[in-house]
């Protein structure tokens, strides 16, 4: 990381901002978890603003972030920009209800849990159990953080056998986002 990047990161931290971009993996999860913990300890901010632009990634890494977000005593406001997909969408949904904002151009993707497994028969059977557990965690997360009230409806609309791309309006309808808002309210989708 360059000296300029470190200065910019420090400036974001002064305002309680976490920027999560790219694939969610262990390193990104560790960074985000540490930042949330530091904000809770420091007492310097009254809320955390998490800006997310992520195509998804690892379930264990994402659920580690979600666990720390739920642990946080500070409210965490989430803003989705660019793309919030797969595990990125689950992290976004965990934000404080009423403060989960997406921009009009945000792409949203929901899909069933997917994985690739290699190994002998016994290893594949053991791996299948973990896959079932991950699927159950994902279903329970949607039921907790969306307006969908049953596994059947969830699998009909959002966790189908094919990728489900959502408009920002559909995200509001399903209760996985609360507000559609341009980052600059003066623009309102019009040309300057």
Give residue ranges: language-model regions.
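Terminal-region recognition feature
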Residues: 1-192
